[in-house]
């Protein structure tokens, strides 16, 4: 019985150590979500004309914390842009973390 308990504790510990933590982003899931972002953020030198003309930032290589904070601010209304507010409203905290992990891991060269 004692041997079985030790094995169970060992197996659970190994599982918990290898599993991603809550709130950590998964770049693979982020890649899938990022396909909706590519239409604007994936075009070099793209400028939007709505609601005003300005250059759309490239996201590859951005700090994960910056991306999460920006998306949270769009979702809360602290940052204003109609398209981004609408998109951020559909994202969960995990979606934001996944997107941030993907873009954080994307090389700066991919931003050019």
Regions found by a protein language model. Name each.
Residues 49-55:
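Short cysteine/histidine-rich zinc-coordinating motifs and their immediately flanking basic loops
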Residues 24-48:
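Sequence/structural segment immediately N-terminal to covalent heme-attachment motifs in c-type
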Residues 1-9:
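Bacterial N-terminal signal peptides that target proteins for export
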Residues 29, 66, 83-86, 98:
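Extracytoplasmic/secreted proteins, especially bacterial periplasmic and envelope-associated proteins
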Residues 76-79, 87-112:
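C-terminal capping alpha-helices of c-type cytochrome domains
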Residues 14, 18-20:
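N-terminal signal peptide c-region/cleavage motif recognized by signal peptidases
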Residues 56-58, 68-75, 86-89:
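A structural feature that tracks compact, well-ordered secondary-structure segments
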């Amino acid at each position: 019985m004692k041997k079985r308990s030790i094995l169970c504790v060992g197996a659970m510990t190994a599982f918990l150590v290898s599993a991603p933590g809550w709130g950590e982003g998964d770049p693979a899931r982020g890649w899938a979500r990022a396909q909706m972002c590519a239409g604007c953020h994936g075009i070099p030198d793209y400028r939007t004309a709505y609601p005003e003309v300005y250059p759309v930032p490239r996201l590859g290589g951005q700090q994960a914390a910056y991306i999460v904070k920006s998306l949270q601010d769009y979702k809360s209304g602290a940052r204003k842009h109609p398209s981004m507010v609408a998109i951020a409203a559909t994202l969960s905290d995990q979606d934001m973390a996944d997107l941030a992990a993907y873009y954080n891991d994307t090389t700066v060269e991919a931003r050019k």
